[in-house]
A protein has these predicted regions:
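Acidic/polar low-complexity surface segments
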Residues: 121-139, 143-147, 263-272, 317-327, ...
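Concave beta-strand-loop units of leucine-rich repeat
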Residues: 91-95, 182-187, 229-236, 258-265, ...
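N-terminal adaptor/linker regions at the entrance to substrate-recognition repeat cores
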Residues: 2-266, 520-521
Length: 521
């Protein structure tokens, strides 16, 4: 029997089953199908307009839109198609009002109809079943209110447990999601451990990861997820743990991760360690941007040794609460990236937002990067002893200070494949020697002897920027004016056949902040 010979009732049911992905192509295939499916087309267009790009309402004290995950769960229960239309989910409320959100959550959950709707979703969830979770217990936990004398369940980062439960349920319902911005409360996600609250949440997150990873481009939730976008401002006091992103890292469709303010440091004090959760799995990440983060060499090692396809990595260092990474081991940080991503990385940026102490070891060689075309580096990443020297600088219990004149020439550091180089004089540091940046720059561009041959045949651009450090502009130019002295042949720039561009061009992280509207506190 031909399709158009089917009874109208059956054809109507077939059209309904094409929602949302295939409706447009099917409905427009012929007049008969379009005529039967006219109401579906109208509903489809309304759903696309309303739900393709979902974000919480941020307009203060209004009753327009949704401000809590509980409200969205109720809407999805009443109209399950909503979940299939959401392709971008922005759960971050930048003008977050915790008291207002708490009142709204309470109002939603005090309504018996809403409670029944959320309970219905929980009861239908095969994710909860596979995680051996009791839907009734989840509903009770989501309705829990912290009383006087109760201990917060989220350790030292506040109590947003029930909101994170609701968000996790949302993450089980979004098969067509492409871009995700996590909510404010995600920083309160408990670290994975054996405590009942942590096991309760992470058991479901593990099922989400497994289903999305094993069933790409299927109806599994998050199986089409491609980008994780920033969900926090850069802050000294507030810290997002890199482990919060563990559920998304192994999902094969996730190729881009742009995040801010994450910590991956095991210092036994104020750091938050990062451990790769999904043993035996690797990430399919291609592009990774870590803005205003606080990660040591061990933390970055634990991450990048599981990213075999990474082509772009950009990192800016930011000291966190109580001086976490006050001194930073830049040399071993870059060496770890080189060891694990040297054969794939094409673009690398390592810059410094804030450094109250010293660079413990400096970058002395990047020869292990086999495909690196573009590099953007803060001048200070070179201002320390080589990682293999056994020497370390530090402001705490360490009197050693590296002789900046021993910083290798830039030509000895860069790999043969390099095409573009951007170096930045930082706008502010805590180092007692205010001239250390300029001394480092002078060492990097010192003269070469006539007999020496440079090994960067494809280099076409060398850029030296001073960002907001305008006071350094004249000093930077003087360094290159000295090198441009015609009485000194074979200077580095002549050998490279390029002239340095000296401007106030923005660093990658400044562009990042503008693009994603990220602020510093």
């Amino acid at each position: 029997m031909l399709l158009l010979e089917l009874p109208v009732e059956l054809l109507d049911k077939i059209i309904e089953l094409t929602l949302p992905d295939s409706l447009e192509s099917f409905a427009l295939s012929c007049k008969t199908v379009y005529s039967v499916g006219r109401d579906y087309v109208r509903s489809h267009n309304l759903h696309k307009q309303r739900w393709t790009c979902f974000r919480y309402d941020n307009r203060g004290n209004t009753d327009h839109g949704f401000k809590t995950p509980m409200e969205l769960l109720v809407a999805i229960y009443e109209d399950p198609l909503i979940a299939s239309y959401i392709q971008t989910a922005d759960f971050w409320q930048k003008d977050y009002n915790e008291e207002q959100i708490a009142r709204l959550k309470k109002r939603v959950l005090e309504d018996d109809t809403n409670l029944a709707a959320i309970g219905g979703l929980l009861g239908q969830s095969h994710y909860l079943r596979h995680a051996n979770q009791d839907p009734e217990q989840w509903l009770a936990e989501m309705c829990w209110e912290e009383g006087e004398g109760d201990e917060p369940r989220d350790a030292y980062r506040g109590d947003h447990y029930s909101t994170n439960m609701a968000t996790i349920i949302l993450l089980t319902l979004l098969p067509n999601l492409r871009e995700l911005i996590l909510p404010n409360e995600w920083l309160s996600l408990p670290e994975p451990n054996d405590s009942p609250p942590a096991k309760q949440l992470w058991s479901v997150l593990d099922v989400i990861t497994c289903e999305a990873g094993l069933r790409p481009l299927s109806n599994a939730s998050l199986s089409r997820l491609n980008k994780i976008l920033p969900y926090a401002h850069v802050s000294y006091r507030d810290r997002n743990a890199l482990i919060e992103l563990n559920p998304f890292l192994p999902i094969k469709s996730v190729e881009h991760m742009h995040i801010a303010n994450c910590v991956a440091v095991d210092d036994g004090h104020t750091g938050i360690p990062f451990t790769w959760r999904n043993t035996g799995q690797t990430s399919n990440l291609r592009i990774l941007e870590l803005a205003g983060c606080c990660i040591d060499s061990d933390g970055i090692t634990e991450l990048v040794k599981h990213t075999p396809h990474l082509t772009t990595l950009k990192y800016s260092h930011h000291v966190k609460w109580h001086g976490c990474q006050y001194d930073w081991d830049a040399g071993n940080f870059v060496r770890a990236i080189e060891e694990h991503c040297g054969s794939t990385l094409e673009n690398l940026a390592v810059t410094i937002d804030s450094l109250d102490g010293m660079v413990e070891t400096g970058v002395d060689s990047m020869q292990g990067f086999q495909r690196l075309h573009s590099v953007e580096l803060d001048i200070l990443v070179f201002a320390g002893p080589p990682p293999g020297s056994g020497l370390r600088q530090g402001t705490i219990d360490n009197g050693y200070k590296y002789d900046i004149s021993k910083v290798p020439c830039l030509a000895d550091i860069l790999p043969r494949s390099i095409k573009q180089v951007s170096l930045f004089v930082p706008s502010s540091t805590g180092d007692a020697d205010a001239g250390i940046e300029l001394q480092t720059l002078a060492s990097l561009f010192r003269q070469y002897a006539p007999s020496e041959t440079l090994g960067q045949p494809d280099l076409v651009e060398v850029h030296v920027g001073f960002g907001h450090a305008y006071a350094y502009a004249d000093e930077v130019r003087q360094i290159f004016d000295a090198h441009n002295d015609s009485s000194k042949p074979n200077r580095l720039m002549d050998k490279w056949h390029v002239d340095p561009t000296i401007t106030d061009r923005k660093t990658w992280v400044e562009d990042f902040h503008e693009k994603y509207a990220i602020s510093y506190d």
